[in-house]
Amino acid sequence: ETVSTDFDTGDRLYFEPLTNEDVMNVIKAENPIGVVVAFGGQTAIKLTKFLDKKGIKILGTSAESIDIAEDRERFDELLEKYGIFRPKGESVMTLDEALTAAERLEYPVLLRPSYVIGGQNMTIAYTDDDVKQYMAIILAQGIENPVLVDKYMMGTELEVDCISDGEDVLIPGIMEHIERAGVHSGDSIAVYPAWNLSDRMTQIIIESSKNLAIELRTKGLVNIQYLIYKDELYVIEVNPRSSRTIPYISKVTGVPMVDLATRAMLGEKLKDMGYGTGLYRKSPYIAVKVPVFSFEKLINVDNHLGPEMKSTGEVLGVAGTLEEALYKGLIGAGYKMKKKGGVFITVRNSDKAEIGEIAKKYYDLGFRIYATEGTADVLKKYGIDAVSVKKIHESKTNNTLTLIESGKIQYVISTSAKGRIPSRDSVKIRRKTVERNIPCLTSLDTANALADCLKSHYSQHSTELIDINHMREEKLMLKFTKMQGIGNDYIYCSTFDQEIS
């Protein structure tokens, strides 16, 4: 979410922190006609109020519009105007207010600060104790903006990146997350185009995105995260800025989003840019974005995925089917995709109603299933001959940790969310998978997708390299130009005639 630091990309390159004082020093040195905050992530967005008060011109979406998107009460008024739903929620400043709000909304609830960065300090609370623990941490840091308490709804999460010129909106594509709401969008596996979306819901998303972008008077990029729960569309949040999915959606759709957004910020109209308005046509392939993690370098960090972002990168899998694209993405992210061996399963009580069908897929593929006692009892009801494994404190020589160390396990499914304390069994198990380089799936949706992928029998020998440009209806002109100072000849490629000239 930052500008490239290549010396030959920008006219100027400053290595300075994004603080009020340092940014003002750069502005004084450069004396620009205006500044763009939309490409600096949430950190840059937080500078908008300060810059506006200093009389600095904000190019693109105004400081006022950004504040409406971030201010709960003002944003709720906007949603009410267009009949757009959002999960019920309240803004609080104290522990008592947070407990009262959680009781009113009913558990589970999602707790997060305003102007949140990367899901930082974001958590799902299931009890009063969870709220007390969270608020103690937040209040100790000192808060300037309210803490948001939202009703947590486990539905299908979707993401839309739009370009707006203030009058029209272009939506290059709609992405669907494999993991249900509750896992940070940066840690979710995202699929383009969305594969479970009805025509009716697609139209609602298009209309809602257009209304929100225009009513907020956005000029440039806007990222909107949606939730489908019981066949109703809810807005999770609207970010009037560039998101981490911009490079992904630009690449797979062929829409140069940064270029078009910058032109819109400077006053050009979308209808004059050649890409139309509304929802851009679907690409003839499936593209899957898979997150990459670096848990092996982080000591005592739980690899359970939740509202707080933990990934450090991402890879892209492209193919004609979802299963093949997912297989490519998982291989690229470091999964070995082993097709025999053992699967160890331990899930929280709320997941036991769903784990049976998922475990059956692994069982039918020939995997040996191991599980903790409670989970094993559930699996046996589905005809799965699961081997019951003792917990860490129940046996020193034959427990969950020794099983993982034995080399019998190829995949671990562990969904217990109680992961803030390193001494807990669930955290120890997940950390052991990191040490042994065993894929650990902390969401049932990820485990289900992996099982379907293994069931499809794709391998590195049966997949093929895809040139997405060849599959598009309109080919893109690719130019390889000479780089300064290295003395190499350049190659000019025109994909219209598929010949190098």
Say what each PLM segment does.
Residues 1-84, 93-100, 318-458:
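ATP-binding N-terminal substructure of ATP-dependent carboxylate-amine bond-forming enzymes
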Residues 1-32, 43-45, 57-60, 82, ...:
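ATP-dependent carboxylate activation and anion-phosphoryl transfer catalytic cores
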Residues 451-473:
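Class I SAM-dependent methyltransferase SAM-binding "motif I" and its flanking Rossmann-like core
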